[in-house]
């Protein structure tokens, strides 16, 4: 057990310091914005320092563990720890939240509450990724929904209340299954309830019971990821939310579903995962094609990007279902890669909306000449989204592709068929990405906007865009930087399926 509570400080620091926002003077919003930004930067530096100096990459076991008894009656512990699987998403959370805070600079209405909710969400997400106790994982999972709901319902488009209600109904419905699964696993087969991940990972269940648990967790994570048909909240939510909230949703929230699938469904329930993995692969392939073919029909720019996110999540599902080292590494790389790409696309969609007050592509056109910087950034990020070689999306999708082809668990013909379907999805992706660029930036100027709106990206917006673009290029050129974090843990997880 770790002597100094690094992880507890990392989890609690944003919400504790965030609650002091309400004590700051009300003279303008600048003090509060800088205060929030400083908290995010401090938290990111603290996390990076802890992982650099106290985390061994070659050890697949849980490190920096903390174990404090919390509720004596229920044997409930505040149990934290990280391994190769959680280190990437935690660093991604810190990076995206810091940039989302900077992106939220124009927010002036109820700015104190807005920034506090962003910091509360930050704590909940890091808590979810670093929990080593199932009930604590559930509590963090639920705690993080409250700020998201308030961010969606209070700031955004005209239909924001509808989309926020839809979001909370879907996620709360999924959470019921998550709670039943958590309590079922914790109370099964022993006199004393245990919710410790390490203990549960070595416990075996009757296959029928394991399948029931698996389905419960799968529904909860399928809503968050999202897996079709649980995806309909996502386009509505992204279409209405403020773009800084969209960055957090696309960059981190969706990845929590993928993380849960690997952490709980794969690690704790390997027999059921073997049974369900062919189904996951089929659903993933259908999802890639379905979302990629639905996206070109969306005239709302943010909804089109939302459907592209759903399509990219299909690769993560296939990687998780492939039961191979390469496939799972590809899925984890896609989690990180799409976190940057999705956040950057929504940020640029939001900055273009700030200028022209339009979201519908058929009303846009000819923006390349008045907004050259925005045009350049959005073009490069669209290329990253369609998996251009040299950018992070390409490496992740290629690894998933190789992972399914080299998997030892499937016959040759099904593997070829799935690879063919994935290839069709990869061909459909440029269709909606490039048509989006064509409708926005080329052709005649269709909209009537006074010229004073037409200033190109300022220093703040360029800084956020470039900060998101650099990791995308970096991972594309040297993917081992991210893969080295998780490769040992992935081998440990996959070995369960071959030696158990």
Swiss-Prot record:
Single biological process term from Gene Ontology: electron transport coupled proton transport
Keywords: Chloroplast, Membrane, NAD, NADP, Plastid, Plastoquinone, Quinone, Thylakoid, Translocase, Transmembrane, Transmembrane helix
Reaction equation(s) it catalyzes: a plastoquinone + NADH + (n+1) H(+)(in) = a plastoquinol + NAD(+) + n H(+)(out); a plastoquinone + NADPH + (n+1) H(+)(in) = a plastoquinol + NADP(+) + n H(+)(out)
Compartmental location: Plastid, Chloroplast thylakoid membrane
Record keyword NAD present: yes
EC number of the protein: 7.1.1.-
Top-rank lineage group of the source organism: Eukaryota
Keyword hit for Transit peptide: no
Bilayer-crossing regions: 4-24, 37-57, 87-107, 111-131, 134-154, 167-187, 208-228, 242-262, 272-292, 305-325, 330-350, 386-406, 416-436, 462-482
Main location: plastid
Membrane topology: Multi-pass membrane protein
Molecular functions per Gene Ontology: NADH dehydrogenase (ubiquinone) activity; ubiquinone binding
Gene Ontology CC terms, in alphabetical order: chloroplast thylakoid membrane
PANTHER family xrefs: NAD(P)H-QUINONE OXIDOREDUCTASE CHAIN 4, CHLOROPLASTIC, NADH-UBIQUINONE OXIDOREDUCTASE CHAIN 4
HAMAP family: NDH1_NuoM
Similarity annotation: Belongs to the complex I subunit 4 family.
Protein name: NAD(P)H-quinone oxidoreductase chain 4, chloroplastic
Source organism of this protein record: Oenothera biennis (German evening primrose)
